[in-house]
Amino acid sequence: MIFCLSSGQTPMAFRLPVVAEPEMPAGTDVSSTGRLPRWLKRPIPKSNSNHLTDSLMEEYGLETVCDNAKCPNRMECYSQQTATFMVLGNVCTRPCGFCAVSRGRPPAAPAVDEPDRIAKAAERLGLKHVVITSVTRDDLPDGGADHFHNCVIAVRERTGATTEVLTPDFVHCKEALARVIEAKPTVFNHNMETVPRLYRRVRGPKSDYAWTLEMMRQVKRYDAEVKTKSGLMLGLGEERGELLDALSDLREHDVDFLTLGQYLQPGEKYLPVVRYVPPEEFDELADIAKSMGFKKVASGPFVRSSYHARDMAETE
């Protein structure tokens, strides 16, 4: 077993500036009425598959990040019989300012049969690409790395599907990261989320921009065949130059795939939206990112980490 995490551990000497409340940039589409711009309004898909996906999650006692994080795409994904499995419970030990997942002290140890239940549900849904994410578990000695490992193995052995893990940061533990990569997921994903200036404000006091980048480089050192992926939310007050610098940092650290999406405030107690980014700007950013060398880019208002993840995983 890996024992390398402690609640007070902060091994990397990377200092971020104290962040003031961001000023609203010119041209913003945030209105005083709180109404969404037209491009963020769309019909809710209706399909019997919505019920099938929901019922299977309930039958196998599984959580999805789709529901817990109030993802705007969940009905679309459910209608296509896809979902992102959320392991290690539904209570997170990190207080990220953007995330709707419950936070606090997790009530239970990892369920040893969860990998098998995920594999069975994936088989019933006929999934060809399975995405597995988790809450952050700073209370576990390995941050849940061994559980990720077991989930990937179980899914691959039962279904033959490609796999994608969207992991927490494991509090700078390279041994934990190596344990996940030993399982040979098709794609390793860890989200940058925002630019350095806003990092602690958005991701909390334990977050570390430098370690996020180092994780990506380490993955390639452990297994060069594993594809790496990261993403950022836009509309939190980042400036254009800061965003492009962050994308450049990701490419310099061997990130293959990139996602860019609009941050949407999940409730009143979360970080406010500073700006709604128009679709044409997302398109422009996609072109810039591709010119930087990203192998695949998904950029748009509704893009999220695992949205149409199979399409990205199949890209060479």
Curated annotation (Swiss-Prot):
Annotated localization: Cytoplasm
Catalytic activity: [[Fe-S] cluster scaffold protein carrying a second [4Fe-4S](2+) cluster] + N(6)-octanoyl-L-lysyl-[protein] + 2 oxidized [2Fe-2S]-[ferredoxin] + 2 S-adenosyl-L-methionine + 4 H(+) = [[Fe-S] cluster scaffold protein] + N(6)-[(R)-dihydrolipoyl]-L-lysyl-[protein] + 4 Fe(3+) + 2 hydrogen sulfide + 2 5'-deoxyadenosine + 2 L-methionine + 2 reduced [2Fe-2S]-[ferredoxin]
GO molecular function: 4 iron, 4 sulfur cluster binding; lipoate synthase activity; metal ion binding
InterPro entries in UniProt: Aldolase_TIM, Elp3/MiaA/NifB-like_rSAM, Lipoyl_synth, rSAM
Residues annotated for [4Fe-4S] cluster 2 binding in this entry: 92, 96, 99
Record PROSITE patterns: RADICAL_SAM
Pfam families: Radical_SAM
Keyword Mitochondrion among UniProt keywords: no
EC number: 2.8.1.8
Chief localization: cytoplasm
UniProt remark on cofactor binding: Binds 2 [4Fe-4S] clusters per subunit. One cluster is coordinated with 3 cysteines and an exchangeable S-adenosyl-L-methionine.
Domain Radical SAM core: 78-295
Transmembrane regions: none
Pathway: Protein modification; protein lipoylation via endogenous pathway; protein N(6)-(lipoyl)lysine from octanoyl-[acyl-carrier-protein]: step 2/2
Keywords attached to this entry: 4Fe-4S, Cytoplasm, Iron, Iron-sulfur, Metal-binding, S-adenosyl-L-methionine, Transferase
Necessary cofactors: [4Fe-4S] cluster
HAMAP family (UniProt xref): Lipoyl_synth
Family indicated by similarity: Belongs to the radical SAM superfamily. Lipoyl synthase family.
Protein name, UniProt field: Lipoyl synthase
Organism: Rhodopirellula baltica (strain DSM 10527 / NCIMB 13988 / SH1)
Lineage, top ranks: Bacteria, Pseudomonadati, Planctomycetota, Planctomycetia, Pirellulales
